């Protein structure tokens, strides 16, 4: 959805998601008995805090779990400039005693390959900015156009060409503001996943290796008939990377501890959690001689891996090791059973 970025002068509360307009009056700054709809503040509080107002699109932009901006975006975005968003801006602007309105933010989806959808969203945001200026004579100084830039997780996929596509987006923003007679805002982008995903590699130790005969109608992801799939279990899974189970995200894997046989077999790398959806890599060809104790490397796990890791089934979250020209060092230590037990409350 699109979000209104506002900053509240009272300090102390964590960032909050406001899902309905009425919530703006229901947030109480820490250390104060006042609500944001009132003018009372705690003496000495002056730092800014960011709040966000979500505007949910009433459309499925592409995928039921991970939206990718597409042709439905233009229709869905009409609400941004034509109704709810403008009403929210006006309501916030009327509360200048406790709120400072600094800009608008949009998020249109994830793993988007080019700037086309971002350009559509940007045009709507600039139109919203112009409409608000025309009615309230206030120029929103900042516009955050979000992120969701695609990353190549498997062979054959492409990452977004940031230089080319963000250049197109910046040109479009300049063009539409000239056409609207508006000064260009400060533009922000969010390239987090695009930046950090390729920097992470997760290492797993192989456990049981089990070949399973498939029916005569079975095919691989390329459509080729297959008669056997080898299930390769590892000592991790959905507790350290929830994306395959949550979104159906695809990854690949490589044998990392030795050179395997030239002959390969179709494999599915599965986790240790005894869940049908606990899949690390849905389909990959690995050396036919893969065996217990081998190390598999799953690349491009630097984003939404460790940050969404959990103690599912009381699994321990693995360590994070930084590797550079100067060598390797532990950045985050491995969890232990004592860590889990430390949360227990003794009588």
Predicted regions and their residues:
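C-terminal helical cap(s) of enzyme catalytic domains, especially alpha/beta-barrels
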Residues: 24-29, 158-166, 316
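Active-site-proximal beta-alpha core segment in soluble small-molecule metabolic enzymes
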Residues: 7-142, 172, 177
């Amino acid at each position: 959805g699109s979000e209104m970025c506002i900053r509240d002068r009272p300090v102390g509360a964590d960032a909050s998601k406001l899902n309905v307009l009425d919530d703006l009056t229901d947030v109480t700054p820490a250390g104060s008995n006042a609500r944001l709809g009132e003018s009372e503040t705690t003496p000495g509080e002056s730092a800014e805090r960011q709040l966000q107002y979500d505007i949910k699109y009433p459309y499925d932009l592409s995928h039921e779990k991970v939206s990718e901006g597409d042709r439905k975006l233009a229709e869905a975005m009409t609400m941004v400039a034509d109704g709810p968003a403008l009403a929210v801006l006006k309501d916030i602007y009327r509360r200048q005693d406790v709120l400072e309105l600094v800009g608008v933010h949009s998020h249109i989806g994830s793993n988007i390959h080019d700037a086309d959808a971002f350009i559509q969203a940007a045009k709507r945001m600039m139109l919203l900015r112009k409409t608000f200026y025309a009615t309230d004579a206030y120029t929103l100084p900042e516009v955050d156009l979000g992120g969701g830039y695609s990353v190549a997780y498997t062979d054959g996929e492409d990452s977004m060409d940031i230089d080319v596509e963000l250049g197109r987006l910046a040109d479009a923003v300049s063009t539409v503001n000239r056409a609207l007679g508006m000064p260009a805002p400060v533009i922000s982008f969010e390239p987090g996943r695009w930046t950090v995903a390729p920097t992470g590699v997760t290492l797993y130790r192989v456990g049981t290796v089990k070949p399973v005969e498939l029916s005569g109608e079975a095919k691989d992801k390329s459509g080729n008939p297959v008669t056997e799939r080898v299930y390769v279990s590892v000592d991790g899974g959905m507790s350290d990377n929830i994306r395959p189970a949550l979104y159906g995200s695809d990854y690949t894997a490589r044998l990392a501890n030795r050179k395997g046989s030239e002959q390969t077999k179709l494999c599915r790398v599965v986790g240790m959690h005894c869940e049908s959806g606990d899949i690390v890599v849905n389909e990959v060809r690995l050396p036919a001689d893969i065996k217990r104790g081998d190390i598999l490397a799953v690349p491009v796990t630097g984003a939404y891996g460790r940050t969404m890791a959990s103690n599912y089934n009381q699994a321990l979250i693995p360590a994070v090791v930084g590797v550079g020209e100067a060598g390797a060092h532990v950045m985050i230590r491995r969890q232990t059973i004592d860590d889990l037990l430390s949360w227990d409350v003794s009588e």
